[in-house]
């Protein structure tokens, strides 16, 4: 049926072309009626049939929303039509013989086939948009534990702070909760920390009373303030990158006024995503002497707490969800299976794809900056955190002008993409970060699949992003799926133009994990792909409705369907099929 329609369409267009170009030149033809531009006239100028062409007509792009390869064919054929029109119109009347008619017939047949391809592309793109709209509404984030107390939580005195979770080069993190129940207030009073009292010094060792301690669903990150001054506006200006993943409610306290007064072109506000940390509250307060401070970070304390301290008396506090551990800690005690490790890598790619879509580059991806929360079945859910080194400037996007060596290129030098680490400053030099975080995910994949990170360590085994060659990359274990092995090598290509984007890489793993039967077909067409997507949509909606708690794989399928783009999906499918054909 499709071939019959294509032939019919081709004959119709060929007949129109013959009538158009073999007629007598002049203002009229045929029975003396004014010339009406038929379909061929529009094709000769690259227009759709029936589209007005004239000085007052608005131009319309061909193949809008269709894959690039179809638009290329359409534009190429339109150019060929224009050349043929010039060639045959310039001939005397009757100059078009049987050969010319055959050329036009073949030309019209080609147009009919391309029209059929375009119709398939339009149907596929429309179906992807409809599926995306459904799952964008269904794909809900984790609930905000402070949502019921919208105007609370903007003072340090309102929190009960527990033991230290960890510290980095610029902050310390503590577990915390907001006591509201009577039993929690009794526990808070037993260690001398009732809401509203706000003691500056918390006795060390009291947090070890585990039997009395309540659950700590929150984590408070206390930034170390060495050079930002003590005013809220100065702290906000210096540490604004930490607020990129903050919700709007997080800035409703004292920072609301400061954020309102800030000039345009500052750091972006990142939209929420399940694989990206969310800051629930952000506020400034006096620096307290928290448990272990004198041993872990005495030099950054203010002089009133430590005579040799260099810190200011006021700093920034960020309230977030308390996760079980970091990715480094999780991998130290667990060895995920190859399939689970592939799903973990996929989660990082989903988070990075969201950052790129929002115009944000993390620039400090490492296993210490990825948090892990196991689901009910013990499967890890990964969340990207610590945006202190991110690039989130509305003025430059992901293209950072690199005019001098004083421009900050990011945080982690070991996992810095080659296009970043080898960049040289100049008047027009620009660093493109659009695929830099995807490269870092490729390096982290070695750790997730159970091997040492090749860009860490010492000696000859360590690779440097500035100078490594792709042939030097160690091979992943044979137990790792071949598609995942090939993807890791592709993500670590030195040439960023040959590297897949995070969105295409994520789609590729989605197809590899869930679309085995569909991609096994030798003749993969858009209609078959859409049929598979509709089946996945129905199954995912049913699983999401029946399960009390979403498992990791169900949540990943919902993310995949909520980010459907036909162009990126087609690229991933073609790339995956080519890899499988080469095996």
Predicted segment positions?
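Non-catalytic localization/regulatory regions flanking kinase domains
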Residues: 1-262, 516-583
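Activation segment/activation loop of eukaryotic-type protein kinase catalytic domains
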Residues: 368-414, 426
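Conserved C-terminal C-lobe helix
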Residues: 479-493
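Conserved structural core of kinase catalytic domains
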Residues: 271, 278-334
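Catalytic-loop of the protein kinase fold
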Residues: 356-374
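Conserved C-lobe activation region of Hanks-type protein kinase-like domains
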Residues: 243, 420-479
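Terminal C-lobe "cap" of eukaryotic-type protein kinase domains
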Residues: 493-519
């Amino acid at each position: 049926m499709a071939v019959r329609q294509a032939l019919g369409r081709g004959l119709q267009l060929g007949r129109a072309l013959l009538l158009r170009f073999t007629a007598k030149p002049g203002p009229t033809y045929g029975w003396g009626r004014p010339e009406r531009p038929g379909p061929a006239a529009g094709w000769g100028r690259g227009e759709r049939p029936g589209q007005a062409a004239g000085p007052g007509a608005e131009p319309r792009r061909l193949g809008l929303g269709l894959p690039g390869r179809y638009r290329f064919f359409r534009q190429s054929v339109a150019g060929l039509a224009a050349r043929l029109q010039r060639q045959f119109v310039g001939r005397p009347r009757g100059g078009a013989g049987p050969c010319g008619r055959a050329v036009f017939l073949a030309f019209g047949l080609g147009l009919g086939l391309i029209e059929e391809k375009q119709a398939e592309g339009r149907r596929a793109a429309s179906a992807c948009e409809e599926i995306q709209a459904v799952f964008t509404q269904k794909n809900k984030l984790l609930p905000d534990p402070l949502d019921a107390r919208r105007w609370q939580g903007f003072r340090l005195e309102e929190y009960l702070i527990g033991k230290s979770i960890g510290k980095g080069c610029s902050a310390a993190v503590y577990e915390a909760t907001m006591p509201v129940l009577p039993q929690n207030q009794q526990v808070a009073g037993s260690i001398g920390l009732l809401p509203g009292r706000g003691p500056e010094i918390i006795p060390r060792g009291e947090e070890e009373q585990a039997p009395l301690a309540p659950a700590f669903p929150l984590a408070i990150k206390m930034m170390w303030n060495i050079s930002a001054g003590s005013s809220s506006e100065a702290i906000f200006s210096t540490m604004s990158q930490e607020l990129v993943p903050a919700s709007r409610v997080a800035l409703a306290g004292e920072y609301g006024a400061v954020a309102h007064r800030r000039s345009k072109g500052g750091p972006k506000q990142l939209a929420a995503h399940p694989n990206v940390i969310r800051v629930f509250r952000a506020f400034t307060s006096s620096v307290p002497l928290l448990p272990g401070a004198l041993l872990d970070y005495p030099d950054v304390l203010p002089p009133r707490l430590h005579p040799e301290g260099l810190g200011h008396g006021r700093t920034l506090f960020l309230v977030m969800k308390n996760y079980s551990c970091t990715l480094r800690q999780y991998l130290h005690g667990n060895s995920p299976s190859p399939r689970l490790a592939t799903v973990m890598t996929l989660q990082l790619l989903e988070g990075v794809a969201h950052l790129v879509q929002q115009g944000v580059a993390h620039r400090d991806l490492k296993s210490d900056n990825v948090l892990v929360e196991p689901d009910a079945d013990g499967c890890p859910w990964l969340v990207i955190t610590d945006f202190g080194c991110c690039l989130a400037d509305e003025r430059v996007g992901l293209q950072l002008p690199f005019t001098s060596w004083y421009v900050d290129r990011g945080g982690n030098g070991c996992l810095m993409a080659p296009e970043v680490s080898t960049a040289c400053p100049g008047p027009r030099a620009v660093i493109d970060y659009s695929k830099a975080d995807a490269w870092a995910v490729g390096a982290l994949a070695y750790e997730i699949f159970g091997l040492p990170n090749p860009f860490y360590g010492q000696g000859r085994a360590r690779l440097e992003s500035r100078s490594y060659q792709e042939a030097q990359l160690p091979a992943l274990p044979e137990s790792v799926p071949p598609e995942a092995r090939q993807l890791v090598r592709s993500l670590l290509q030195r040439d960023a133009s040959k590297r897949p984007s995070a969105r295409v890489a994520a789609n590729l793993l989605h197809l590899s994990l869930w679309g085995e039967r569909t991609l096994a077909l030798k003749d993969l067409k858009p209609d078959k792909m859409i049929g598979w997507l509709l089946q996945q949509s129905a199954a995912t909606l049913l699983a999401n409705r029946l399960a009390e708690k979403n498992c990791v794989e169900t949540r990943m399928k919902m993310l995949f369907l909520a980010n459907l783009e036909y162009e990126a999906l087609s690229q991933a499918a073609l790339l995956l099929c080519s890899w499988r054909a080469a095996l």
